[in-house]
């Protein structure tokens, strides 16, 4: 068995039968074929920034290390073709330094480009789908590569077809991004609303987003975590009004379909759970949405803590939180919501 601890940001002690870095599509195909012939499960990881290992993984972990960025442009748009192993934050930095704007709100999101479409990553008013042109996918059972446009990706809130139809036996090899040359700042959330849209630069947004994230989110290199552990729940307008009767300052974000998105971190905070600990796992003291590996936590410690948080919030608000983090058992991904229910 090989130690997985350095390859995922929760840094929970767990092992895999084998860990392989794949630097080419041919290597991905070879590892898949070998693993299938030995009847071993395969897990593809980028930087392991959104996974929780519940047990040792009884198979092969393949680290996506497909690298490279190409840039083309026309009169109106910049087009980036980004291979799946590229670090997401470094890509954002690279784009700003090259005068290509539109990714700045997504600064400091951990992980790599190939993982971004799976979760439809988002922050500060921008989601991956807003900048996505296409996603290139390798079907490992046929060795064919195909391209999905944005609509075919079926993006939703922390949701995409890559969690369903294209989950097993597929790997994202590259993403295509389409960024307007006529750049418009997105200043909808947090301290960004205080900026003047007429004078703000993309670099200033980038710096502010980095500052906000660094001030309230723990650095995974120092404190194991997987970022936001829970999704922000979406409730009906009736349910929202009911909660608001008792909590006048409830942060909320009306959605196009009439539903209302609530801030999961605020709900957890109202339950006085910051700092709450089970085993080696704890709710972060600064940002309640983040569960941390405080001291030698096991996967089960985190599961028990997540269950306690979910139950406590449900009892107070009638809202059941869903994990954003993917749970990995000995044989592969499992339903995270079922595990913590």
Swiss-Prot record:
Its EC number is 1.3.1.98. Its cofactor is FAD. It holds the Pfam family FAD_binding_4. InterPro entries: FAD-bd_PCMH, FAD-bd_PCMH-like_sf, FAD-bd_PCMH_sub1, FAD-bd_PCMH_sub2, MurB, MurB_C, MurB_C_sf, Oxid_FAD_bind_N. Keywords: Cell cycle, Cell division, Cell shape, Cell wall biogenesis/degradation, Cytoplasm, FAD, Flavoprotein, NADP, Oxidoreductase, Peptidoglycan synthesis. GO terms for molecular function: FAD binding; UDP-N-acetylmuramate dehydrogenase activity. Pathway: Cell wall biogenesis; peptidoglycan biosynthesis. GO terms for biological process: cell division; cell wall organization; peptidoglycan biosynthetic process; regulation of cell shape. It is found in: Cytoplasm. GO terms for cellular component: cytosol. Belongs to the MurB family. Cell wall formation. This is UDP-N-acetylenolpyruvoylglucosamine reductase. The lineage of its organism: Bacteria, Pseudomonadati, Pseudomonadota, Gammaproteobacteria, Pasteurellales.
């Amino acid at each position: 068995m090989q130690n997985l601890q350095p390859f995922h940001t929760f840094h929970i002690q767990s092992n895999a039968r084998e860990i392989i870095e794949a630097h080419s599509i041919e290597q991905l195909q070879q590892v898949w074929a070998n693993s299938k012939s030995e009847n071993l499960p395969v897990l593809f990881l980028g930087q392991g920034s959104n996974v929780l290992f519940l047990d040792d993984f009884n198979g092969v972990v393949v680290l996506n290390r497909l690298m490279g960025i190409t840039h083309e442009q026309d009169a109106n748009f910049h087009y980036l073709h980004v291979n799946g192993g590229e670090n997401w934050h470094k890509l954002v930095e690279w784009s700003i330094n090259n005068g290509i704007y539109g990714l700045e709100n997504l600064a400091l999101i951990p992980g790599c480009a190939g993982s971004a479409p799976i979760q439809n990553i988002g922050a500060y008013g921008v989601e991956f789908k807003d900048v996505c042109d296409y996603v290139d996918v390798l079907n490992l059972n046929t060795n064919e590569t195909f391209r999905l446009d944005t609509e075919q990706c079926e993006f939703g809130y922390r949701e995409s077809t890559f969690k369903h139809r294209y989950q097993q036996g597929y790997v994202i090899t590259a993403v295509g991004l389409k960024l307007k040359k006529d750049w418009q700042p997105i200043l909808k959330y947090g301290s960004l609303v205080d900026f003047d849209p007429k004078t703000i630069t993309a670099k200033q947004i980038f710096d502010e987003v980095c500052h906000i994230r660094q001030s309230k989110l723990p650095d995974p290199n120092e404190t194991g975590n997987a970022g936001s552990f829970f999704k922000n729940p979406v409730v009906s307008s009736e349910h929202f009004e009911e909660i608001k009767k008792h909590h006048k300052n409830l942060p909320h974000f009306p959605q196009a379909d009439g539903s209302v998105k609530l801030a999961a971190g605020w709900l957890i905070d109202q339950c006085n759970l910051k700092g709450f600990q089970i085993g080696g796992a704890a709710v972060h003291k600064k940002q309640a949405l983040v569960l941390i590996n405080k001291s030698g936590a096991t996967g089960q410690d985190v599961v028990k803590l997540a269950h306690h948080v979910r139950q406590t919030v449900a009892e107070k608000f009638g809202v059941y939180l869903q994990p954003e983090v993917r749970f990995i058992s000995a044989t592969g991904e499992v339903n995270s919501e079922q595990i913590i229910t």
